[in-house]
Every structure is written in structure tokens, then in C-alpha cells.
Amino acid sequence: MTCGFSTVGSGFGSRAFSCVSACGPRPGRCCITAAPYRGISCYRGLTGGFGSRSVCGGFRAGYCSRSFGYRSGGVGGLSPPCITTVSVNESLLTPLNLEIDPNAQCVKQEEKEQIKCLNNRFAAFIDKVRFLEQQNKLLETKLQFYQNRQCCESNLEPLFEGYIETLRREAECVEADSGRLSSELNHVQEVLEGYKKKYEEEVALRATAENEFVALKKDVDCAYIRKSDLEANSEALIQEIDFLRRLYEEEIRVLQANISDTSVIVKMDNSRGLNMDNIVAEIKAQYDDIASRSRAEAESWYRSKCEEIKATVIRHGETLRRTKEEINELNRLIQRLTAEVENAKCQNSKLEAAVTQAEQQGEVALNDARCKLAGLEEALQKAKQDMACLLKEYQEVMNSKLGLDIEIATYRRLLEGEEQRLCEGVGAVNVCVSSSRGGVVCGDLCVSGSRPVTGSVCSAPCSGNLAVSTGLCAPCGQLNTTCGGGSCSLGRC
């Protein structure tokens, strides 16, 4: 879009306007401010008592100041010595179609909100960085605590190893005691086997003695039967002797009676006379001798047999008593040894159970320690991962912060460069002012004591932007319109 404008020199304006009047401002300040907006300079704050359409024909003595961010300029001029009449320009009575962009203020407000949001984000990033630093310190503290805790818990392993070594030594002692008790048990079993053999021998001897006793008893019975037979024979012989005695006595009595009845006594010298008394006496003596000898022999034999049997019975009874005592003693010894063996077995089983329980407890404690160690290692790994994530986020935040710092530094350098450029001397400044209240015409403007600048008024509708430049025109709008005052003398807008 081309913007043509007419040059207005410093002169005197007239106050006699019908609809369009030019008025000089009161003695005071004339300030034009500008705020940068996407490469377009927007100037605000022009004070001077303008109407809807007014043209300033002259300025009283005053001054202007620069108080804008991107480019600004103050204008001032000398007041005319008197008011002269001017001719009325009918073209000035035509209302201007400014076509101001209504979204400019909204865009500025959005810019402010975006700047606020960026500031809030920057503050949030700073807070997040601080929070991440605190979290980093907390994680470092936790890591140090877990490392110290791991070191403390790692000291438990030698204790468990010492306890396991003690249990192993006790198990070895128990095994040695078990071997010793096994050897003693074998010795006791050998002694027991010897006693069992002796007991079996004694039982065999007892059976032999009982057999001998039975045989001797049979012999005694036979002797007693023989004694009974001999006694019966002796009685029979005694009865027979008595019978024969009575018989001989009766025969003698009969013979004596016969002899006494005979009155003739014959005396004969017969040497062959039979003496029955002597014969009977001799027979009786023989029988008595035989009976006494038989009785004596039977009694002596019976007595000897009885003595032998009694001695054998006494001897075997003593042997049996000693055997019974030995058997009882062996039974007591067997019971005692059995009790000792049972006690040793119980003690061995208890020790084995204690060793097994100790091994199980050691295994459980070792597994628990390993599980705790694995949990701590997992927690440490997780903490390392969390710390790595936090470090990554922290690095990202620091990168974002660095980018923001670079942008801020870049903006600062740009602003400082622009201020430095503004502080330095500038050339001719073209001012294009358009607002909703009308156009502004400034003649022979001065910027900070520099050479006069030429002001121009765009009669065509503009976007409402005020542009001040040295040899360049800012865009006047988005529409393809031209300023009706003529062509731009310093360049195209």
C-alpha cells in the first residue's frame, strides 16, 4: 500500500475554521510515546488539545521528550506572533474514513497476557528447579542413608558366618561325641554279647545240671526203690525167719512133748546128733549178717548217694544262685546301658534337631538378609533411576532456562541496541499519525534537538498506527489504500 502525504511547513495557522480548525496548544509539553508491536511502531500519548479534525498550524515555545520503547519523537515549534486569517480548505471538511483495526488493543492485551504467562512459566521453572534441587538433595541424603544402611547391614554377614561356623563346630563336636558314643555303644554291645554268651552258657550249664539232677534223681529213685525192695525183702525175710522160728519152736515143743510122753529114755552116744538150735542160730546169724550187711551197704550207698546228690544240689544251687545274680546284674547292666543308649540317642537326636534348626535358622536369616539386600539394591537402583529421571528433568529445565536466558539476553541486547541507536543522532523522521479522532499535522518537528523533521498527514484511512522513522515509512494498514495528499517523499509505506 502506498501512502501519499502533503508536506506542511512551519507557518502560522488561522483560528477561523468553520468545521476544521487549527488550534495551537497551550504552553506545555507535547509527548509522543510508542510501544513496539511486531515490527510496527504504535505511538500514543500525544497531548495538545485536538478535536475530531484539527490541524495544528503552529506551536508555541515548548519542548518535547522521548519516552517510548522502540522509536519516539517529540515535536515542538515556535508560537506565531499573531493570528492571521487563513483560507478554508473545503477538502478538510470531508469526514475521514480511518478504518482503525479494532483488534489492536486485544492483540496488545494478548501480548501482555502472553508476557505474564511467560513470566509465570519462568517463575514456575525456577520454582521447579529449586524443587528439583531439593529433591536432588533429598535423594542424595537417601542414597547416603541407604549406602550407610547397606554398610551397616553388610556387617551382619560376618556375624552370621561366625554363628554358622560356631554351629558347624558344635555339629562337629556332636558328630565326634556321636562317634565316641557309637564306639562306646559298640563296646557295650560287645560286652552285652559276651554277657549274653555267658548267660547262654550258664543256661546251658543249668540245663546240664538240671539234666544231671534229673539223672541223679532217677538214680536216687532207683536206690530208694531198691532200698524199699530190700526193706521189703528184709521184712519178708524177718517174717520168714519168725515163721521158721515159730515153726522150729513148735516142732521142738512137739518133739519135747513127744519126748516127755515117752517114758523110755534111750541114751545113745551118737556124735552125729543134730543140733537144730545151733543150725537155726547159725542160719539166723547168717541171715542177720546178710541183712545187716545188706542194710549197711544200702544205707551207706544211700547215704553216699544222698550226700553226693546234696553236694551236687548245693553246688548247682550255689552255681544257680550265682548265675541268677549274674543274670540279674546283667539285666540291670543291660537296662542301665539301654537307658544310657536311649539317652544318648535322644541327646543325639536333640543335637541333630538343634543343628538342623540352627542350619534352618541360619538359612532363613541368610535368605532374609539376602532378600533385604536385594530390596535395598532394588530401592537403590530405583533411587538411581529416579535420580537419573530427576537429573534428566533438571537438565531439560536447565536447558529451557538456558534457552530463556539466551532469549532474554537477546531481547536485552536488542533493546540496548535500539536504545543506543535512539540515543545516537537520527536523520529525518517521517511521522504518520492516524487515530479515531482525526489526523494530526505536525510541521517542522524536532527530535531531541536534531534537525527539523517533516510531518505528514495521511488523508486516506489508516490502521491507526503512528510511525516515526528516519527515511522509512511504517505500514499504514492492511488495506490497499493510498493517502490522498500525494506521494510519499521519503519512501513507500
UniProtKB/Swiss-Prot annotation:
GO terms for cellular component: keratin filament. Residues 275-418 are annotated as: Coil 2. One of its GO terms (biological process) is intermediate filament organization. The keyword Metal-binding does not apply. Belongs to the intermediate filament family. Keywords: Coiled coil, Intermediate filament, Isopeptide bond, Keratin, Ubl conjugation. Heterotetramer of two type I and two type II keratins. There are two types of hair/microfibrillar keratin, I (acidic) and II (neutral to basic). SMART domains: Filament. Residues 147-156 are annotated as: Linker 1. PANTHER family: GATA-TYPE DOMAIN-CONTAINING PROTEIN, KERATIN, TYPE II CUTICULAR HB3. It comes from Bos taurus (Bovine). One of its GO terms (molecular function) is structural constituent of skin epidermis. Residues 419-493 are annotated as: Tail. The keyword Iron does not apply. Residues 111-422 form the IF rod domain. Residues 157-257 are annotated as: Coil 1B. This is Keratin, type II cuticular Hb3. There is a cross-link at residue 217 (Glycyl lysine isopeptide (Lys-Gly) (interchain with G-Cter in SUMO1)). The gene is KRT83. Residues 1-111 are annotated as: Head. Residues 112-146 are annotated as: Coil 1A.
